[in-house]
């Protein structure tokens, strides 16, 4: 990576991290902290938790397309301003309705797809996977940090303190965008990172992508629904006090990561991705199902550890699988649909989890999660193990398309080629285990 690429990537990753940290800090505490609100019901709790997912799902692709026309920075700045406004509304709210409105406004600052497109503007093709890995790492770190900071901030400043801190993080994001991210006059259209509305209908019919989209919906449904019940279980049944809560979450999430790592490495090494995938879904489903029975402290913590270990594996596996399975030149659009399903899953998990809690109690929450995950497991049975495919974006220049196709088609390991009139780019899908990269230079 060049100095410019590294600076841009770290800056974009930090904006991602600030935003995700603000959104997730409420998860471990909101179920307990809102219990005395005048309009509190478990259903309203679920709506508050998932509200950001609905608005983000609706707006993320349109805002990404808008950034193609007016530039990345104006859209990102506007999204962060709306995010800060939502944080203000939630911070001063003393009702569940006010919290719901604030969380919905936070989600309306849907800048994830625009930030990903900005990565394309600043990084060369050969460095893009490194940039995406850095951003993924920042999101994962933000999630773990949020689970620790949420209880700490709430213990000192109350629930409103989380939203005030979130507003500060939004301001920090604005400063990074304005002062740290390098200036550029170019906005590259790259089908590997940006959506094209004309391709959506075809991608929705792809059987493999359908299963992966159902998967990410179910995964984030489960995550959001579980956090309706987990805080009260830890407080009332396990007996975790406020000062110990951050360390318990660190143990669950950190321990889950280290449990997941060997399984992921082995599945890649021995080409057992599908088997590991199905096992992880079933582990999540069984963990949720077992939580509906009599719970002791040790059993509860063990089941939650297994749940988060499987979650970590699936959260890391799904985007990688999607990038290998999507048709050449359609990764940006496929990721847009995938992210929309992810956010809709978060909204549905909050809504249905809250309704289940209100009607059937904690067992209803974990039962609904187990059912959703079992449905996903059945869908996932039809998946084919991913091939080691990678899409390269090559500059065509002034060479004739037919001549380029003739040259590139003779390269061993080339699986598919997409040339789009007027773009001067070729999207070439290759088998990483066979292709000679030097022959594509």
Per-range role (PLM):
Residues 2-3, 182-213:
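Juxtamembrane intracellular "pre-TM" segments in multi-pass secondary transporters
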Residues 58-94:
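Conserved MFS/SLC helix-loop-helix module at the cytosolic interface between two early adjacent transmembrane helices
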Residues 60-71, 259-272:
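Helix-to-loop junctions at the C-terminal end of transmembrane segments
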Residues 69-79, 268-281:
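Cytoplasmic membrane-interface "Motif A"-like loop-to-helix N-cap segments
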Residues 102-139:
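Cytoplasmic helix-loop-helix junction between adjacent transmembrane helices
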Residues 168-187, 376-384:
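C-terminal membrane-cytosol helix-exit motif in multi-pass small-molecule transporters
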């Amino acid at each position: 990576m060049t100095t410019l690429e590294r600076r841009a990537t770290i800056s974009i990753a930090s904006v991602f991290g600030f935003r995700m940290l603000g959104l997730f800090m409420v998860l471990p505490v909101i179920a307990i902290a809102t219990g005395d609100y005048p309009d509190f019901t478990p259903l309203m709790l679920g709506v508050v938790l998932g509200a950001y997912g609905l608005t983000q799902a609706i707006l993320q692709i349109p805002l990404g397309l808008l950034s193609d026309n007016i530039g990345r920075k104006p859209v990102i700045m506007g999204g962060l301003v709306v995010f800060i406004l939502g944080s203000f509304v939630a911070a001063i709210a003393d009702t569940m309705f006010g919290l719901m409105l604030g969380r919905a406004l936070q989600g309306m600052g849907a800048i994830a797809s625009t930030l990903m497109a900005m990565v394309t503007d600043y990084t060369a093709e050969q460095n893009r996977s490194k940039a995406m890995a850095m951003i993924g790492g920042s999101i994962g770190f933000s999630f773990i940090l949020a689970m620790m900071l949420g209880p700490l901030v709430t213990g000192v400043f109350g629930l409103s303190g989380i939203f005030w801190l979130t507003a500060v993080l939004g301001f920090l994001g604005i400063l990074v965008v304005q002062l740290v991210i390098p200036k550029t006059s170019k906005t590259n259209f790259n089908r590997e990172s940006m959506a094209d509305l004309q391709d959506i209908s075809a991608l929705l019919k792809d059987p493999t992508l359908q299963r992966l989209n159902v998967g990410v919906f179910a995964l984030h449904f489960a995550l959001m629904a579980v956090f309706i019940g987990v805080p009260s279980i830890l407080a009332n049944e396990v007996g975790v006090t406020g000062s110990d809560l951050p360390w318990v979450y660190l143990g669950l999430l950190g321990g889950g990561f280290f449990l997941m790592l060997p399984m992921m490495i082995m599945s890649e090494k021995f080409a057992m991705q599908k088997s590991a995938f199905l096992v992880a879904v079933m582990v999540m489903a069984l963990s949720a199902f077992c939580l509906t029975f009599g719970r002791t402290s040790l059993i509860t913590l063990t089941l939650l550890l297994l749940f988060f270990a499987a979650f970590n594996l699936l959260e890391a596996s799904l985007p990688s699988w999607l990038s290998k399975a999507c048709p050449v030149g359609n990764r940006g659009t496929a990721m847009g649909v995938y992210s929309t399903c992810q956010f809709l899953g978060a909204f549905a998990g909050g809504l249905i989890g809250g309704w289940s809690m209100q009607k059937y109690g904690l067992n209803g929450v974990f039962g609904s999660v187990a059912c959703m995950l079992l449905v996903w497991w059945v869908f996932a049975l039809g998946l084919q193990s991913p091939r080691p495919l990678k899409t390269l974006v090559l500059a065509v220049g002034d060479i004739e398309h037919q001549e380029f196709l003739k040259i590139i088609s003779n390269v061993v390991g080339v699986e598919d080629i997409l040339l789009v009139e007027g773009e001067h780019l070729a999207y070439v899908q290759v088998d990483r285990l066979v292709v000679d990269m030097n022959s594509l230079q």
